[in-house]
Each structure stands twice: as C-alpha cells, then as structure tokens.
C-alpha cells in the first residue's frame, strides 16, 4: 500500500511572510532537525548522486522530488516517483511554489520549508 500523508505533513505551521530559504526535516525522528539550504537544484531520493540521499526509506524512488529556484522563487516538483509526493497533505501535481511553513512528504520523510 502507498503511504498516506502523515499528520505532521497535514499540519501546517502558521504562514510566515517572506521567502523560504531552507528545508528542515521533521520526520523520521532519526533525521529531525537536519537542515538543507535552498538554492540551485536539490534532488531527494535513494540514488547516491542525489543531494539528499534516503536509502533506507522503501517508499522513496531513486530520484523522487526536486527543489529548485525559478525566477528567484523556491519550487518543488515530483520527479515521476512511484508513490508520489505530498505538498501540505495533497498529492503534488506539477511544480508548486514553496512558502515558509509548507510541508512536503516523500515516502515517510516530512520536510518543512522555512
């Protein structure tokens, strides 16, 4: 079965003003607090060539989701993953603008844009 959006992925932090500048991992607990600065292309997946490698998450594709800048704005897009990516609890279709407080779930990993 496919993973369902976790409660943490559905809960959004109070919307903040400004531009998201970093990604902070919330789940799983073993990665909680790990921070990645946004900028350029950041691909998350099981492939060792990814910027964020999650080899121990069975629900993650080799190249699962990409975070990138478009005209200076942080974006997120699913890369055709098998199990999908969720943005604020909804399945991500196409690319979406990332705002501070947005949550992205790929497999069992939940990341918050800050």
Model-identified regions with their sequence ranges:
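Short, compositionally biased
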Residues: 113-114
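Intrinsically disordered, low-complexity acidic Ser/Thr-rich regulatory segments
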Residues: 1-56, 68
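Forkhead-associated
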Residues: 37-110
């Amino acid at each position: 079965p496919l993973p369902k959006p976790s409660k943490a992925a559905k809960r959004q932090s109070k919307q903040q003003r400004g531009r998201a500048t970093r990604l902070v991992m919330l789940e799983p607990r073993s990665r909680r607090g790990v921070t990645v600065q946004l900028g350029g292309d950041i691909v998350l997946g099981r492939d060792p060539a990814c910027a964020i490698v999650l080899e121990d998450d069975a629900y993650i594709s080799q190249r699962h989701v990409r975070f990138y800048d478009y005209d200076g704005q942080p974006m997120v897009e699913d890369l055709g993953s098998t199990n999908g990516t969720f943005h604020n609890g909804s399945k991500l279709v196409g690319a979406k603008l990332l705002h501070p407080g947005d949550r992205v779930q790929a497999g069992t990993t939940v990341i918050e844009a800050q």
